[in-house]
From Swiss-Prot:
This is ATP phosphoribosyltransferase regulatory subunit. PANTHER family: HISTIDINE--TRNA LIGASE, MITOCHONDRIAL-RELATED, HISTIDYL-TRNA SYNTHETASE. InterPro entries: aa-tRNA-synth_II/BPL/LPL, HisRS-like_core, HisRS/HisZ, HisZ. CDD domains: HisRS-like_core. Keywords: Amino-acid biosynthesis, Cytoplasm, Histidine biosynthesis. Heteromultimer composed of HisG and HisZ subunits. One of its GO terms (biological process) is histidyl-tRNA aminoacylation. It comes from Burkholderia mallei (strain ATCC 23344). GO terms for molecular function: histidine-tRNA ligase activity. Required for the first step of histidine biosynthesis. May allow the feedback regulation of ATP phosphoribosyltransferase activity by histidine. It holds the Pfam family tRNA-synt_His.
């Protein structure tokens, strides 16, 4: 085997892509800070049980596992940063009231989520802890859309769902709850034949409700259909009211209701949302409410948040990260060194051409040059 080969669905990030990713990362983190979010940096490696406190079997299967040579315990390479941030809020910060946290870092998956998906993603996201009201859901939803607009994406569609609908159906039908994982997979994949097979022997009301969910997709008027087709349970009524409220607050994106879009259902407890753009089959960002995630760390708090993969966003973003630069010669000249240093201190990119290498790669847009005129170093257009 060639020593330069990488594992399947793992790739290096080359300069032009890395520069674009870093430009987007800085934009998003600066925007999160403008909303009052504090940065945290959880470790890439943790004890396995700490990483798998939520997320169900799907997260367990996606997590790389290895043995710690120090303690002998099983470790995991994180596949999702959300449980880690919940641990920080619950166990380390232990604050009262509202806490806003954000993060950015790599996550690793044992299997790719799609045909061309990378198994190493650069996850960036934001979370609010400590407020159970829809105001927190609305802020996170707006921050996610704001972040996507900052990346230059257009014609964003926001799909809304609610974990409370399925939870209410399972709570009143034990047989349905027992096959919950299989039902979730059938609904998420909109596999109607499999869904029909799984619901054949359930109670008539539960069967009809579960089979209706894949059809409850469209604009906000779908909520009226849902009220008519789903059981008149208080939990379902509240869930539909929540979705109606959140949908009405969105002013800068198309809104769709999809009551079968149950990505991450295993740890969500309320409103869920995913963002889509034209030409990309999978969601470019997703999030929702997960009030019980911190329970495993001794302190369950209301929580909602979102995340996205910066590598995927950089691939589809029209943002141009090739900034202007200044080309300077390489000389043993104190005045030149001082001029270059002053320009860099002022935020300029200055590239000094090494002897015999006067050309500059297209990676840099050197639209100006630092030249010597009458004993002084000045900037001129190129």
């Amino acid at each position: 085997m060639s020593t330069w080969l990488l594992p399947e669905n793992i790739a290096d990030v080359l300069p032009s892509e890395a520069r674009k990713i870093e430009e987007l990362r800085r934009r998003l983190l600066d925007r999160f800070r403008s909303y009052g979010y504090e940065m945290v940096m959880p470790p890439l490696l943790e004890y396995l049980e700490s990483l798998l406190t939520s997320g169900g079997n799907e997260l367990r299967l996606r997590t790389f596992k290895l043995v710690d040579q120090v303690s002998g315990r099983t470790l995991g390479l994180r596949a999702d940063m959300t449980p880690q941030v919940a641990r920080i809020d619950a166990h380390l910060l232990n604050r009262q009231g509202v806490t806003r946290l954000c993060y950015a870092g790599p996550v690793l998956h044992t299997r790719p989520r799609g045909l061309h998906a990378s198994r190493e993603q650069l996850q960036i996201g934001a979370e609010i802890y400590g407020h159970a009201g829809l105001e927190a859901d609305q802020e996170i939803q707006q921050l996610m859309l704001d972040a996507l607009h900052l990346t230059g994406l257009k014609k964003i569609r926001l799909d809304l769902c609610h974990a409370g609908v399925l939870a209410a159906l399972f709570a009143r039908d034990a047989a349905a709850a027992e096959r919950g994982e299989a039902l979730y997979e059938a609904l998420a994949g909109k596999d109607v034949p499999r869904l029909n097979e799984l619901t054949d022997d359930l109670g008539a009301d539960t069967r009809a409700a579960l089979r209706a969910l894949p059809r409850l997709y469209g604009d906000a008027s779908v909520l009226d259909d849902a009220r008519r087709l789903l059981p008149a349970l208080p939990e379902i009524a509240r869930a539909l009211d929540d979705l109606a409220h959140l949908a009405a607050q969105v002013k800068d994106a198309e809104v769709a209701i999809d009551l079968a879009d149950l990505r991450g259902y295993a740890y969500h407890s309320g409103a869920m949302f995913a963002a889509y753009v034209d030409g990309v089959p999978n969601a470019v960002a997703h999030g929702g409410r997960y009030d019980h995630v911190g329970q495993a760390y001794g302190r369950a708090r209301p929580a909602t948040g979102f995340s996205l993969d910066l590598r995927e966003i950089a691939r589809i973003s029209p943002v141009e990260a090739r900034g202007a630069a200044i080309l300077a010669p390489w000389k043993q000249d104190d005045a030149l060194r001082a001029a270059v240093g002053a320009l860099r201190d002022a935020g300029e990119v200055v590239i000094q051409a090494l002897p015999g290498h006067d050309h500059v790669l297209d990676e840099f847009a050197c639209d100006r040059a630092l030249v010597e005129r009458d004993g002084a170093w000045v900037i001129e257009p190129r």
